[in-house]
């Protein structure tokens, strides 16, 4: 990658973080997308700022031949639109090469939820005789009880928990805060983690702030767990619980939270608020899952099903 492209990418990421307040994971996705295009573009001259629409079409065709998924390509186009839109506003370009490029069609896939019995088995999988096991039980309980995104869970600051009132203050997408009730079960395990496990993981030493805030969930190095670490934990506990790990993901716990609430009669608007969705249309996909559940119940138990 050319040094000029590396410099342009850094400036874009700095600007976008300052103006939009996007999450660190989103910035890293933008970086990967732009660096991938820059490396493919190496040697062609002009770098990222000199690319035209024809070259972008060539890159998209190359990605198709390389078996990149349509979802990955759609995200790439979103990154490039943000990047070249900023270049256009700043006068670094006189046009937007992503204009008139349509994103690939994405089939609307229904979120996959675990059954309630599978959730119970998964939550019971950690070894409660170890500090890490207690921490993991609290994390799993909290993710299912509050419907958190994995990034929200691993980045949750200690000050975001109010055990007296039984609520979490969660910072979601777009740096938007929301209050989420804990529930008795998740509050119980969170209290046990804070009382019995966290001091041992921290070796009774102060936990340093990360990005200005002290993390709630830590490992033995007194650092927050990464999304990848938590992903691996969920897969491991799925195997312990007798569930195919390929069918389980951290986001699946969020899907299960939403689906089970709807199955038990939750209001769609309330669910939207709990999930932190900016648009109700994003939440409505769960009604399809709930409807399928009701149809299966009817077919199984109604005399004329």
From Swiss-Prot:
Major subcellular location class: cytoplasm
One Pfam family linked to the record: Phage_int_SAM_1
Keyword DNA-binding assigned: yes
Molecular function as annotated in GO: DNA binding; tyrosine-based site-specific recombinase activity
CDD domains assigned to the protein according to its UniProt record, in alphabetical order: INT_XerDC_C
GO (cellular component) term, any one: cytoplasm
Residues at the active site: 149, 173, 251, 254, 277, 286 (o-(3'-phospho-dna)-tyrosine intermediate)
Entry keyword set: Cell cycle, Cell division, Chromosome partition, Cytoplasm, DNA integration, DNA recombination, DNA-binding
InterPro entries associated with the record: CB, DNA_brk_join_enz, Integrase-like_cat_sf, Integrase_catalytic, Integrase_recombinase_N, Integrase_SAM-like_N, Recomb_XerD, Tyrosine_recombinase_XerC/XerD
Domain of life: Bacteria
Biological process annotations from GO: cell division; chromosome segregation; DNA transposition
Domain Tyr recombinase: 109-299
Function, as annotated: Site-specific tyrosine recombinase, which acts by catalyzing the cutting and rejoining of the recombining DNA molecules. The XerC-XerD complex is essential to convert dimers of the bacterial chromosome into monomers to permit their segregation at cell division. It also contributes to the segregational stability of plasmids.
PANTHER family xref list: PHAGE INTEGRASE-RELATED (PTHR30349), TYROSINE RECOMBINASE XERD (PTHR30349:SF90)
Subunit structure: Forms a cyclic heterotetrameric complex composed of two molecules of XerC and two molecules of XerD.
Name of the protein in question: Tyrosine recombinase XerD
Organism expressing this protein natively: Xanthomonas axonopodis pv. citri (strain 306)
């Amino acid at each position: 990658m050319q040094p000029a492209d590396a410099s342009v990418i850094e400036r874009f990421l700095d600007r976008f973080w300052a103006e939009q307040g996007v999450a660190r994971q989103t910035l890293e996705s933008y970086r990967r997308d732009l660096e991938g295009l820059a490396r493919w573009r190496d040697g062609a001259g002009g770098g990222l700022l000199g690319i035209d629409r024809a070259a972008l079409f060539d890159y998209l065709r190359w990605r198709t031949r390389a078996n990149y998924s349509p979802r990955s390509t759609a995200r790439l186009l979103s990154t490039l639109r943000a990047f070249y839109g900023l270049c256009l506003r700043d006068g670094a370009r006189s046009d937007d090469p992503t204009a008139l490029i349509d994103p690939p069609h994405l089939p609307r896939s229904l979120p996959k939820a675990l059954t309630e019995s599978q959730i119970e088995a998964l939550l019971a999988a950690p070894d409660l005789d170890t500090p890490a096991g207690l921490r993991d039980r609290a994390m799993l309980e909290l993710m299912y009880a509050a419907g958190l995104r994995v990034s929200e869970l691993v980045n949750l600051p200690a000050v975001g928990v109010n055990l007296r009132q039984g609520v979490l203050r969660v910072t979601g997408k777009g740096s938007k805060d929301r209050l989420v009730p804990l529930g008795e079960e998740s509050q119980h395990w969170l209290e046990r983690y804070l009382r019995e496990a966290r001091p041992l993981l921290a070796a009774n030493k102060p936990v340093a702030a990360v990005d200005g805030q002290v993390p709630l969930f830590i490992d033995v190095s007194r650092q927050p767990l990464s999304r990848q670490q938590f992903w691996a934990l969920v897969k491991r506990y799925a195997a312990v619980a007798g569930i195919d790990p390929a069918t389980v993901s951290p986001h699946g716990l969020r899907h299960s939270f939403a689906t089970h609430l709807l199955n038990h009669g939750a209001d769609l608007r309330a669910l939207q608020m709990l999930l932190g969705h900016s648009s109700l249309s994003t939440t409505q996909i769960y009604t399809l899952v709930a409807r399928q559940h009701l149809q299966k119940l009817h077919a199984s138990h109604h005399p004329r099903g």
